[in-house]
């Protein structure tokens, strides 16, 4: 869909198809495929969620489409161990808090990220289903095989993809972010 999405005439045709038939790319969500797997068989439950979008871009919703046709498989760690922070910097409610995402700050999250990228790579490049289309890996690139290098390359386009997770503790101890009076 890259060329259709990036072309004014292509967008016009997609809009017209929707207006006339209530069908076509305009009716699709951002992801056409979703799946859950374990990054390692020893895990009790799946910890990776995969999505596949019918467009190719570096960061979905942020950067323009590539100038070639492609798809974007993404992988999300749905059980991260890294912990971020949200800090209030002013008593003025109009001042945004300071948010530190702290992605990939634990060894486990880095290991899961590398495994997730390897699983996507294997699915896209080694399965008979996709091999017939002669796929090429654009990012991070097949030349990157070392786990830490995969994590580093992957961190260049890491985002929450709509799934920030976490809790805040109420109480009196050092782990509490608010007391009973908020």
Task: Label each residue range with its predicted role.
Residues 1:
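Predominantly flavin-linked oxidoreductase catalytic cores and closely associated redox partners
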Residues 9-182:
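FAD-dependent oxidoreductase catalytic-site/capping-region signature
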């Amino acid at each position: 869909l890259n060329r259709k999405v990036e072309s004014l005439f292509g967008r016009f045709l997609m809009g017209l198809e929707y207006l006339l038939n209530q069908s076509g790319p305009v009716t699709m969500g951002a992801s056409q495929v979703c799946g859950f797997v374990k990054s390692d068989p020893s895990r009790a439950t799946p910890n990776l969620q995969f999505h596949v979008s019918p467009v190719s871009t570096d960061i979905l919703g942020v950067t323009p489409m590539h100038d070639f046709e492609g798809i974007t498989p993404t992988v999300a760690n749905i059980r991260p161990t890294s912990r971020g922070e949200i800090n209030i910097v002013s008593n003025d409610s109009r001042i945004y808090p300071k948010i530190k995402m702290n992605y990939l700050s634990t060894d486990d999250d880095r290991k899961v990220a590398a495994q997730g990228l390897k699983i996507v790579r294997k699915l896209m490049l080694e399965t008979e289903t996709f091999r017939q289309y002669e796929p090429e890996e654009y990012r991070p690139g097949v030349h990157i095989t070392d786990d830490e290098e995969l994590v580093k390359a992957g961190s260049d386009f890491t985002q929450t993809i709509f799934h920030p997770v976490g809790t805040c503790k109420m109480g009196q101890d050092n782990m509490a972010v608010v007391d009973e009076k908020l």
